[in-house]
Amino acid sequence: MIEMAAEKEPFLVPAPPPPLKDESGGGGGPTVPPHQEAASGELRGGTERGPGRCAPSAGSPAAAVGRESPGAAATSSSGPQAQQHRGGGPQAQSHGEARLSDPPGRAAPPDVGEERRGGGGTELGPPAPPRPRNGYQPHRPPGGGGGKRRNSCNVGGGGGGFKHPAFKRRRRVNSDCDSVLPSNFLLGGNIFDPLNLNSLLDEEVSRTLNAETPKSSPLPAKGRDPVEILIPKDITDPLSLNTCTDEGHVVLASPLKTGRKRHRHRGQHHQQQQAAGGSESHPVPPTAPLTPLLHGEGASQQPRHRGQNRDAPQPYELNTAINCRDEVVSPLPSALQGPSGSLSAPPAASVISAPPSSSSRHRKRRRTSSKSEAGARGGGQGSKEKGRGSWGGRHHHHHPLPAAGFKKQQRKFQYGNYCKYYGYRNPSCEDGRLRVLKPEWFRGRDVLDLGCNVGHLTLSIACKWGPSRMVGLDIDSRLIHSARQNIRHYLSEELRLPPQTLEGDPGAEGEEGTTTVRKRSCFPASLTASRGPIAAPQVPLDGADTSVFPNNVVFVTGNYVLDRDDLVEAQTPEYDVVLCLSLTKWVHLNWGDEGLKRMFRRIYRHLRPGGILVLEPQPWSSYGKRKTLTETIYKNYYRIQLKPEQFSSYLTSPDVGFSSYELVATPHNTSKGFQRPVYLFHKARSPSH
C-alpha cells in the first residue's frame, strides 16, 4: 500500500512514537519494514530540506539501494539519513539484529540511544545496550547472531517472576552437557538389547559366545532329550480304568513303599556269609538251611539269599532293619575268637572280599553286637533245639540286654499288629490260606478269628462261605477300626457284581466262576482304589437276617490271653470254629509258655463239642528276629521251653484235651517265610472234661 502510494504521489505518514527507555534493549517495539523506514526518512529529509525538493520514489534506484543495503545507503546519503538507515530508528530492532547491520570491529557511535528531533519528524539513534534486569545479565554469544536460548530464570534471589525449584535450577545451570547413553555392552548388545538376547537366535553366535565361559544362556541342543511316548495297551482305555477289576490286581494311585532301598546291602552281605559258611561242618540235617544257624530266621530269609522274588515285599520289613543287620553279623566276632580254626577262617575271607565301605560299616556293627550278645553266646554247650546249632549254647541264668536298647517305634508292633501285614504277605493275589480252608467248616457255623488284623481273611470267609456269625478279635484298636472300614470295600465289590453271581457254588470251582464274572465288570476299579469304597455304611435294621453278609460279621478289640488260670476254668463254649493263624509266636514272646498254654486251654473250652481249631504256628526260626522288640520279649525268648514242633503233642495231651489233629496243607506263598503248615485239631463230641 505504501509503495503504491509512493509511486503516484508523495504523502505524509506520522512518525511512530519514540521507544521507552526501559525497553530500549528488549527489542519489543513494533517492527517497521525497510520500505517504511525509507519512506519515513524521505519525509524527514523533505521536511528538513524544504518542500521544494522532491523525494525519490520507492521504485527509484536510490530507494532500492536503501532497501537492499543499509550500508550503501549510508555512503550515498548524508547526515541523519545515513544514521537512520544504520540505526534502525523506529524499527526498534533487537540488539542482535543491530549488530548484524554494523561492520565487524566497528565501535558503537557516541550518540547511542540519543534522540534527535527534526522540524517535522522524529529521529532515533541506534538502540541502547540492554540494561541489567533483576541483577541478571543475559549471555551473548560471541559470534553474534541467535544461539540457543537459555532458560531465563531467576537464580540470584530478589525480584519478581516465576522461580523453579532450587534443585532443578542448580542442575540446569551447572550442567555443561547432556546425559551420555551407554555404548559399551559387555555381552555385545546395544541400547535396545543390552543383554544381547537376540544373539541366542543364532546358534553359531551362541557357540562363539560360550566358547570360553557361559556368558549367556546357550541354545538347547536339538534332539538331546528325546520325548518318550507311552502307547497304551488298550487304545480304547488309555488309563487302564477297566482292565484291573479284581481287588488283588488293583494298582493304587499312590502305591505303598516297599522299603527295599533300606536293605540294598543286606542281601549281598548275606550271600557272602552263606558262601563263606558253606564249608563249615555242623551237626544239622542236610535239608536244614544254613542261615538259621546265623540269625534264626531262615524260613523268611531264603528267598533273599538266592536272589528270588526281589520285587515281592518281604515279611517284617517295616521297622526291623537295624535288628536284622545286627543279628546277621553278630555271630562273626565269636567265631573269630573261637578255638576252632575252621570256624574263624571263612568269616575273615568274607570281610576281605567285601567292598571297603561296606566292610567298615559291618565291622562297626560287629563290635557293637558282640558286646551285647557275648554273654548270650558264651559259656557251655546248648541244645540244637534252640535253633543255634554248633554256634554255642545259652545260659538261662544270665542274659544281658542288648546295648542298642529297645526303641519305641519297634515297641509299637510288639504284638505283631502290623498295619500293612496283608500288603506284604499277599502283595498281588488273594490269601493262599483260602485255598486250603474248606467252606463246609464255616457254613452256618459260629466262627472266632483270633488276631484278625485288618480283617481281610475274616471278611472273605464271612462274604463267601456264609457263616452264621463271624467274630474278629485283635488287641490293636486301630486295626479293628480299619477292619470295620473294610466292610464297605467288600460291599462295594458286591455292588459291582451282577446279582446272579452272588450265590455261586462253594469251593474252588465257585471261586473261579466268581473271578470270571469280575473280569466282565465295567465299573472302574481305579476309582475304588483311589477314592475309597462306593458303598454306604451299613445301618443295623431291626429284623434283618444276621446270617447274611455284612450282618454276620463283627470286630472286637481285646486280649484273648487271660491273666490267671482260674479265669480259664470259667470259660463257656460259644463257637464251632476258632481260627488261630500266625498268632502263636506273638503270644509266646509277650506272655511266655504260661500265656500260650492258657490261650490253648481257653480255645478248647471256648469250642462246642465237635468244634475244630485251625492252627497256623510260626516256626521257631522266626522267633529270634523279634526278640529285641521289648525287654519282656527279650527275657521270655530265653525262657521258652515249649517249641512250635511240640504244640501238637501238647494240644492232644490231657492238659488241653483235643482228641485228634491233622495236617491240612502248607499254602504256597511267594515268600517262603509265609509258607507255614496249617493244622486242624478236633474236639470230641463228648468231651472228657
Swiss-Prot record:
Placement of covalent cross-link Glycyl lysine isopeptide (Lys-Gly) (interchain with G-Cter in SUMO2): 643
Residues where N-acetylmethionine is found: 1
GO-annotated biological processes: negative regulation of transcription by RNA polymerase II; positive regulation of G1/S transition of mitotic cell cycle; positive regulation of protein localization to Cajal body; positive regulation of snRNA transcription by RNA polymerase II; RNA methylation; snRNA metabolic process; snRNA modification
Entry-annotated residues carrying Phosphoserine: 57, 60, 69, 101, 152, 175, 179, 216-217, 254, 330, 344, 390
First-level EC class: transferase
Tissue: Expressed in chronic myeloid leukemia cells, adrenal gland, brain, cerebellum, kidney, lung, mammary gland and testis. Weakly or not expressed in other tissues.
Compositional bias annotation for Low complexity: 52-84, 338-359
EC number: 2.1.1.-
Consequence the record notes for mutating residue 421 to A: Nearly abolished methyltransferase activity
Domain called Bin3-type SAM: residue spans: 431-686
Result after altering residue 152 to A: Promotes RNA polymerase II transcription pause-release
Region (Disordered): 1-167, 258-314, 332-407
Residue numbers bearing the Omega-N-methylarginine modification: 117
Biased composition (Basic residues): 258-269, 360-369
Residues bearing the modification Phosphothreonine: 213, 291
Keywords: Acetylation, Isopeptide bond, Methylation, Methyltransferase, Nucleus, Phosphoprotein, S-adenosyl-L-methionine, Transferase, Ubl conjugation
Positions that bind S-adenosyl-L-methionine: 422, 433, 451-453, 474-475, 559-560, 581
GO molecular function: 7SK snRNA binding; O-methyltransferase activity; RNA 5'-gamma-phosphate methyltransferase activity; RNA binding; RNA methyltransferase activity; S-adenosylmethionine-dependent methyltransferase activity; snRNA binding
Biased composition (Basic and acidic residues): 1-10
Subcellular location: Nucleus
An example Gene Ontology CC term for this record: 7SK snRNP
Subunit structure comment from the entry: Core component of the 7SK RNP complex, at least composed of 7SK RNA, LARP7, MEPCE, HEXIM1 (or HEXIM2) and P-TEFb (composed of CDK9 and CCNT1/cyclin-T1). Interacts with METTL16. Interacts with RBM7; upon genotoxic stress this interaction is enhanced, triggering the release of inactive P-TEFb complex from the core, yielding to P-TEFb complex activation.
Protein task: S-adenosyl-L-methionine-dependent methyltransferase that adds a methylphosphate cap at the 5'-end of 7SK snRNA (7SK RNA), leading to stabilize it. Also has a non-enzymatic function as part of the 7SK RNP complex: the 7SK RNP complex sequesters the positive transcription elongation factor b (P-TEFb) in a large inactive 7SK RNP complex preventing RNA polymerase II phosphorylation and subsequent transcriptional elongation. The 7SK RNP complex also promotes snRNA gene transcription by RNA polymerase II via interaction with the little elongation complex (LEC).
Family: Belongs to the methyltransferase superfamily.
Protein name: 7SK snRNA methylphosphate capping enzyme
